Amino acid sequence: MQTQLLHTPEGVRDIYGREYAKKLSVQSLIHDKFSSYGYQDIQTPTFEFFDVFSKEIGTTPSRELYKFFDKEGNTLALRPDFTPSVARCAAKYFMDSPAPLRFCYLGNTFTNTSNLQGKLKEVTQMGAELIGDESAIADAELISLMIESLKNTGLKRFQISVGQVEYFKGICDDAGLDAGTERTLREYISNKNLFGAETLLMEKEVDEKHKNVLLRIAEMFGGIDFLAEAGELAGNTRSRNAIRRLEEVFSVLKLYGLEEYVSFDLGMLSRYNYYTGIIFKAY
């Protein structure tokens, strides 16, 4: 056998033996918790029409999609993320179903990143979607589900960092930034690149008040106490409502007895445009 046929391409790997057994065990434990919360399994295709993952929907950039054509000439793409596929499926089959809808999923996703980035191009994604309920209680449910799922795997020391994209968007609107500038600034702040952010704001001649608040967003993280100050700094209703929403979610999580696992980070701004409200991650 030729030597090169024994190796995998850059960005993919074999999983076997004890590592694979451990992976299956963790997936099972997380799925048990999803089921206990009433989330139903859903399976979407490994590839879809390209437009499902198009830039307008706000998922992975086109250059990072694995694209190909079928015999009819349709442009198809391997899924880089489950959320757009689940949203499409819900819109097709569940429009007349009573809200909210609860789905959970497990499968591999594919992103054609540069080999120099050192990232896996095929990863397993497991998640849950709560559709049709925009309340603070729904936000708290998903955060609670994440906490309880991690605890169910045996983890004890972790934190859930919670952000609110609307806080940033409100200040950008108030400062009169266009969509392109907002998108670039979002990337700078997400990467904690304050020099790039400040240079951009100076080029756009943003007034001193808004510039100072936008530059501070990257450093706005911590416990519940700093949210009040963040609300005062924002001179617009949209941003203040975002802070109020975070406080409401925290109140619900406190009732669940989960407040010790929660912190806040207003500089956490997802590159996915379909995340318009609360976002969170564990570390």
What are these regions (language model features)?
Residues 11, 51-57:
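Catalytic cores of Mg2+-dependent Asp-rich isoprenoid enzymes
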Residues 20-37, 48-51, 62, 68, ...:
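Positively charged, Gly/Ser-enriched RNA/tRNA-binding surfaces
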Residues 160, 165-202:
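Short terminal or interdomain "cap/linker" segment that borders an active site or interface and mediates
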Residues 40-46:
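A short beta-strand-loop structural module common to alpha/beta enzyme folds
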Residues 56-60, 174-176, 278:
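Short low-complexity, flexible loop/linker segments enriched in glycine and/or proline
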Residues 1-19:
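Auxiliary tRNA-acceptor-end handling modules of aminoacyl-tRNA synthetases
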Residues 51-52, 168, 190, 271:
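Short secondary-structure boundary/hinge segments and terminal tails
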Residues 41, 75-79:
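A positional/architectural concept
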